[in-house]
Amino acid sequence: MPRSQRNDNFTDKTFTIVADILLRIIPTAPGEKEAFTYYRDGVMSAQSEGEYAEALQNYYEAMRPEIDPYDRSYILYNIGLIHMSNGEHTEALEYYFQALKRNPSLPQAFNNMAVICHYRGEQAIRQGDPETAEAWSDRAAEYWKQAIALAPGNYIEAQNWLKITGRLGE
């Protein structure tokens, strides 16, 4: 039984019913319906419950029939989120890059890439490697600038960090 049919709370049940009705009413290709089902199972159920392995499997399944680059970008972004949550930063960065190749207007992907770079910069500081720390911090700054350019009202903490570190105007 698909995860979407096992939802236990009212919100998930309501979303599932509405999504199923929309899939029947709106003309969509069979591949799009299949991709959406896997995507819905990954997002609404497995990932939100912390079942990351199952969510990843659903996202990978959603990638097979999904051909729209915009929709694929969100699937790739969500795969990156799971890898980031699991501490697999290199894999997360790869998926964020793939998402941005298909949809360069994803400020959240730029933000998450900046967070990873900032974290790596902090690690380098703790390891006594200021040159590497500076390089990672510079990369974080570039990604945050891109995120802020796409969503100017968001990422206030990043904007403050850029100001404090003197990287805002660079």
UniProtKB/Swiss-Prot annotation:
It is a peripheral membrane protein. InterPro entries: PSI_Ycf3_assembly (IPR022818), TPR-like_helical_dom_sf (IPR011990), TPR_rpt (IPR019734), Ycf3/AcsC/BcsC/TPR_MFPF (IPR051685). This is Photosystem I assembly protein Ycf3. It comes from the Eukaryota. One of its GO terms (cellular component) is chloroplast thylakoid membrane. TPR repeats lie at residues 35-69, 73-106, 121-154. GO terms for biological process: photosynthesis. The gene is ycf3. Belongs to the Ycf3 family. PROSITE patterns: TPR, TPR_REGION. It comes from Cycas taitungensis (Prince sago). It is found in: Plastid, Chloroplast thylakoid membrane. Pfam families: TPR_1 (PF00515). Essential for the assembly of the photosystem I (PSI) complex. May act as a chaperone-like factor to guide the assembly of the PSI subunits. The keyword Translocase does not apply. SMART domains: TPR. The keyword Acetylation does not apply. HAMAP family: Ycf3. Keywords: Chloroplast, Membrane, Photosynthesis, Plastid, Repeat, Thylakoid, TPR repeat.
